[in-house]
Amino acid sequence: MSYVSEQLELLKKKNPGEPEFIQAATEVLTSLEPVIQANPQYEAAGILERIVEPERQIMFRVPWVDDNGKVQVNRGYRVQFNSAIGPYKGGLRLHPSVNLGIIKFLGFEQIFNCLLYT
């Protein structure tokens, strides 16, 4: 089994119920496979393990009062992947349909967005 395949299997085991994140990571790691295979030093340095694991995951409650005066409580999420090149990019998502897998997917994609513009 290749290094990329091993990491994808591990990712699926560690993140069950997060299909959006798994799909994004699978697409990126699969596209990187030729480069990873041609450069064994990346495996030795554990590059893929570090790319797919967030530095921080913050989950918090957001209480608010609706138009009828009733208190509602939503979950908020912030996932931060890599601070190596400076502050984290991203934001907060507070919509009730959002879950941790979606936020991890968005944060994961921001790694590469930041690298392109740095």
Predicted regions and their residues:
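Charged, compositionally biased N-terminal leader segments and the immediate start
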Residues: 1-13
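Extended active-site and interfacial segments that coordinate phosphate-rich ligands
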Residues: 78-109
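Structured beta-strand/loop patches that form or line metal/cofactor-binding pockets in enzymes
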Residues: 41-72
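Conserved small/polar residues in nucleotide/adenosyl-binding loops
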Residues: 117-118
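Ordered core of a single globular domain
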Residues: 9, 16-29
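Beta-strand scaffold of nucleotide-dependent catalytic cores
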Residues: 73-77
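Generic secondary-structure signature for well-ordered alpha-helical cores
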Residues: 12-16, 30-41, 67, 108-113
